[in-house]
Each structure stands twice: as structure tokens, then as C-alpha cells.
């Protein structure tokens, strides 16, 4: 299968702390890394953010998700977010770039 994107949507009063906490946990060698990670703010809903993670494959994403580093990252981020996180798990079917 092709590329895979996971979007994690969440609410926070301190996005800088969320980003700092996420970046404080390195991904060890041997664990698949996202090809890109983008943090975005929802202009229509103050305090709502999403992290967009792109992987080479679904399998890479699942191996990354199962890693101890990811569990540690989630433990650091969770107290900085409010309510439930929403996950979007997306297979890339087509992409056009300019």
C-alpha cells in the first residue's frame, strides 16, 4: 500500500508547550519516522489544533505508534490537552503538487 497520513485533532490552551513536549522525545533508530510532521491551528475554532503526520506506509505508522517513544510522547502531551483527541487515519490515493 502507499503513503499514509494520520491527523490528530485536539484542544489546548498552550500549543507551544504541546510542541515542546512532543519534540522533547527523540525517535530511536530502528523506529519508522514520519516523513513529515505539521502542526496547524483551526482558524474557526480557537484553541483547536491538529498534528498531521505523514508516513511512507500504514505499516510504518503502526510501528511508530507502537514504539515506547510514542507512548512517552503521548504521556507528556496528554496533560497539556483538553477533552478527547480525534484521529483521522487516511490512505493517500492521489496527490498533485505544483
Give the positions of each predicted feature.
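Low-complexity, intrinsically disordered Gly/Pro/Thr-rich segments
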Residues: 71-76
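Short S/T/G/P-rich N-terminal loop/turn motif that feeds into the first structured element of a domain
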Residues: 1-68, 80-98
